[in-house]
Each structure stands twice: as C-alpha cells, then as structure tokens.
Amino acid sequence: YKGVKEALDELGFDLNAIEDEEPDAALGNGGLGRLAACFLDSLSSLGYPAYGCGIRYRYGMFAQKIVDGYQKEIPDDWLRDGNPFEIKRPEYAVTVKFGGYVRSYTDADYHEHYVQEAYQSVRAVPYDLPVVGYNNNVVNTLRIWDAEPIQQFNLDEFDKGDYQKAVEQENLAKNICEVLYPCDDHYAGKELRLKQQYFFVSASVQSAVAKYKKNHDDIRKLHEKVCFQLNDTHPTVTVAELMRILMDEKGLSWDEAWGVTTKCCAYTNHTIMAEALEKWPIDLFQKLLPRIYQIIEEINRRFVNEVKRMYPDNQEKIAKMAILYDGQVKMANLAIVAGYLSLIHISEPTRRRGIS
C-alpha cells in the first residue's frame, strides 16, 4: 500500500480518489458479511491457508437512493463494468442438483446405493478473488460461485411456441444468483433461498473434496486436512451434503462418513434471535433436496434415539433437541449435532441483558 501510494503521489494521483471509483462488491455487507471478510483477512494475515465461499450475486441487496426524503431501493449493478480482481475458473465447475426423487438399489455384495433421478441441475462456475495477508507473502482465495444453465437454450421448445420452456434452464440458473436475501414471506421466496444455500454449499463441498483427492488417496482422512467453518445456519446443510458425497460418491458406510463429517464441521452461531435460527418446512425441503432430506432424517432418527436413551421420560427435551420436529427442519440443531465444535457468539449488550 505504502509503495503504491508514494508512486501515485509522484504522478499526481490521489489513491483515495482512485479507490472511490471501485464499486463495493455486493456480496453481503451485513453483520455476517463483514464477519466473513474479517475471518478471511485474519486468516491470511496470520498465514493460515483458507478458502472463503459464497455466491457471486449480480445485484447484492440493493443500492440506496433518497427521493423526497425517503429511501428508494434500486438494483445494485456492481458488475456493470466488470470486476478486474476476479478470475473465472470454468475448469473447476461442478453440477448441483435440485428436485426429482431418489431411487435405491442393492448391489451383488448387498450394499445399498442411492441415485437421484428426474432432477433439475445447474452448473456452478467459480470465480476466484485474492485475499492478501498483511505484510506477508500469503494470498488466500475468496471463491464465489455463479450459476449457469446446463442447456442454454431449448430450440425445440421455442419452435413449438413454448417460449418460457425454451429458457427455463437459463432462468433457473439466473434466479439463484440475482440478489442476496430474496423476500421469503411467500413459498417461492423460501424455495429460492433454500436453493441459494444448497447451491453454494454443494459446489463448495464438492470443490473441497476434489481438491483433497488430487493429493490424497484416503478420503477417511479428510478431517486431517479440511475443516468447514459454518457461520450461522445458512451453510449448515454442509453436514448432509458432505455425508452424501462420502456415501453416494466415495462409497463410505454411514458410520465411516459420519466419523469423517463430525471431525470436519465446526459451527458458530452469532445470534440467538429466533429468525436467525433457520427452520425449513419439511415438505419444501423434501421436494427440493430429496436425498439431503433422507440423510437428515436418518441423522435425526439416530440422535433422537440417543436422547431417549439418556432422557427416557423427558419429551420436552426431545422436542427441543430434535432436528425434525413439528413439520420443520431445524438447521441449528443439525449443526450442533454434527459439529465437533459448536460455539455461540453473543455481543456484550446481549450479555448485559442476562443472556450467556
């Protein structure tokens, strides 16, 4: 920074004025967004290798204008002029699946297998941005995922006059990455939010496992090299997605996959507000992520049996601790059950109100 500033001063340019020309990346600038940025900055400055993962939103939340004294929200088109700091990495693209149903079969060795069929899919393409450590030679990566259609345009449907069907795949992909926190007071909004969360989680976990396998043969030792830090409940579906990959793609048994997963996932909850402890309707979750729901259902069954064994007559405790209860999938409970480290970060004002 110092060298660049001195060079620009000699040329008669103001570095601060140049910095103001760069639009803020609309990737999440609320509390969790700032926290994630601080995590990456600190990890880089301390010399720890790390990846941060998220979605490459086209419009972020919104740009603010004041009209007649009132706030007016407009799309924040931060990518209008491109982003010179990002590098598109299509060679690391992966496929993310939604919907359909799960078919199971037993092979000749009596091992059960699960296959997702009749699904919709999108192509997750990573864009990498450098996160430079302070006064050292460490550069980590912020990997943000863009969604692209598997099939760009269906000419047959277009020729039949079904113009919406012709661009259905394109719209499915575009909607995932349009805005941060789409309105979820209706079913379509809830579905889109869950799609967003699973999209970037699935892409990121697939990427991490593939990177590990390039240099290591034994997937059972994944925890020796990889840790997934889950900030709040948004990425906690990581637990079930990692189980899916380990069992369905890498051939591990349930117990082997669970042993790896519970050593790889760490969870931090940054608020105890009810709206931040995400719950998803079971019918939505089951429809959109059928295999993931099956895995969560089995995690819940095993965990509830353990709770019943320890507290046989305490139905209230079982109801509070269960992952699936009252028609809801409780994501914080999932993360706590599966995480090898679970923390609650509470601000000082909250502590003073007697919550600890």
Where does each model-flagged region fall?
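Extended, Lys/Arg-enriched charged tracts that mediate electrostatic binding to polyanionic substrates
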Residues: 60-142, 314-325
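Function-dense linear segments that define catalytic or interfacial modules
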Residues: 1-13, 135-227
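Extended, well-ordered alpha-helical scaffold/bundle regions in very large, multi-domain proteins
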Residues: 239, 243-301
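Residue-level detector of conserved catalytic or cofactor/ligand-binding positions
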Residues: 344-350, 354-355
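Glycine-rich phosphate/pyrophosphate-binding loops
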Residues: 40-64, 253-273
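Well-ordered mid-protein domain cores that form the structural environment of catalytic cofactors
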Residues: 2-41
